[in-house]
Amino acid sequence: MSTIRECIMGMKVGSKMKKEKISIIVPCYNEEESLPIFYEEITKIAEEMKKVEFEFIFINDGSKDNTLNIIKDLRKKDDRVRFISFSRNFGKEGGMYAGLEYATGDFVAIMDADMQDPPSMIKEMYHAIKEEGYDCVALCSPKHKDYGLVRKIFTKCWYKLIGKISSTPQVPGARDFRLMKRKVVDAIVNMKEYNRYSKGLFS
């Protein structure tokens, strides 16, 4: 009996707990200027979150500039970088869903490469999921402060229209930048609908 107990104790001491992984999905269309800056910032956050593993999934959505070559160069120097490249532009929704299917993380984030989504928010979003029990945490733009008058009116009308034709309440100002648990990602990927509206699914 004592021998068995010693073996169990030895296993506990000697074994390492597997780190949780966050997959960062980054849809890219003609982002040659912003990609190096984004990569530098997001890898800084990854270094700060030492207890978590990361993978960075860049989706080249038929870019006409040097985006794909930059992604390939990042892949050569960082094995955490993975990518999908489309021969033509399928739109952001298509890129996001391709990334969701490709991601292997326990948590999955979607964010833009243009730095409108602060990479530093990943830490706070992860904390909210881990400590406060949320399944999905999203960033919102407060009252569209940076929008011009025409865009503000259009945006308001858009949300009213979607609210009328959808049974799911829409959150005005909700962005695509969000962090989700694996079970949320799996539920979305398992949906078979061809035309999916991401903000409606995430609401």
Features from the language model and the residues they span:
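N-proximal low-complexity "stem/linker" segments adjacent to membrane-targeting elements
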Residues: 5-44, 51
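Residue-level signature of catalytic and energy-coupling elements of molecular machines
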Residues: 24, 42, 99, 114, ...
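Short beta-strand/loop segment that forms part of the nucleotide-sugar
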Residues: 26, 50-62, 84-85
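Acidic helix N-cap motif at the loop->helix transition within catalytic regions
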Residues: 33-37, 65-74
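Short helix-capping segments at alpha-helix termini
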Residues: 46-52, 75-80
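A conserved acidic beta->alpha catalytic loop
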Residues: 60-68, 115-116
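Acceptor/aglycone-binding surface of glycosyltransferases and processive sugar-polymer synthases
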Residues: 80, 86-88, 92-102, 107, ...
